[in-house]
């Protein structure tokens, strides 16, 4: 098992809210695949593919604590906060919550603190809009954020076109649209 499998199993145990777990897995796999496409299309970026893949799989871990019934989230927090909430959840895990002991059984899946801190940052910063001060900064954070804009949780397996992704950002204001356009120039398909 990969580290994200342990973490997802911990926060989304099978049989608890299987509809939300499946939605998270499908969405995250789609984002991970798209993010890895960026890494492979743009090796000049020097992005760490393991950080990108794992970050994409964990970027939405915080939705379980949010209130968004239309996508099976029955928590109490506003959905806009799912990124920082996910970062807090990963910090709890990193500091040794119950899952830490399980990882000792499989040394291959035991990341160091630096790796998990990178995952926390990706969670906190992946929305890229709506939360001042939490904009993605590293190349890996930006790639996950960019890839995430092409997928929704209402139709998780359908990849949006560039224009559809752009339109979905307009409600958050022009600055986010301009950032996405810049990312598309940097991360989009080569001509």
Regions found by a protein language model. Give the residues of each.
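Metal-dependent catalytic cores of enzymes that make or break cyclic nucleotides
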Residues: 65-84, 91-92, 96-107, 132-137
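Generic beta-strand or strand-like secondary-structure segments
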Residues: 85-92, 118, 122
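Acidic/histidine metal-binding catalytic segments
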Residues: 43-54, 96-126
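Divalent metal-dependent phosphate-bond-processing catalytic cores, especially two-metal-ion Mg2+/Mn2+ enzymes
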Residues: 19-45, 58, 93-98, 115-117, ...
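Short secondary-structure boundary micro-motifs
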Residues: 7, 13, 63, 106, ...
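Intrinsic structural disorder/low-complexity segments
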Residues: 62, 107-110, 187
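Acidic/His-rich, divalent-metal-binding segments that scaffold phosphate/diphosphate chemistry
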Residues: 1-79
């Amino acid at each position: 098992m990969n580290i994200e499998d342990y973490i997802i199993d911990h926060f989304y145990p099978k049989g608890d809210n299987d509809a939300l777990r499946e939605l998270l897995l499908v969405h995250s796999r789609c984002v991970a695949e798209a993010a890895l496409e960026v890494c492979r299309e743009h090796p000049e970026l020097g992005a760490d593919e393991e950080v990108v893949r794992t970050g994409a799989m964990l970027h939405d871990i915080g939705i379980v604590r949010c209130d968004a019934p239309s996508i099976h989230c029955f928590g109490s927090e506003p959905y806009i906060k799912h990124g920082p909430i996910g970062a807090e959840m990963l910090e709890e895990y990193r500091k040794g919550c119950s899952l830490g002991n399980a990882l000792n059984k499989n040394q291959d899946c035991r990341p160091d603190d630096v790796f998990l801190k990178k995952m926390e940052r990706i969670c906190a910063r992946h929305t890229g809009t709506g939360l001042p001060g939490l904009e993605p900064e590293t190349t890996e954070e930006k790639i996950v954020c960019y890839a995430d804009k092409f997928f929704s949780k209402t139709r998780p397996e359908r990849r949006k076109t560039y224009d559809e992704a752009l339109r979905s950002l307009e409600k958050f204001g022009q600055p986010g649209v301009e950032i996405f356009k810049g990312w598309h120039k940097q991360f989009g398909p080569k001509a």
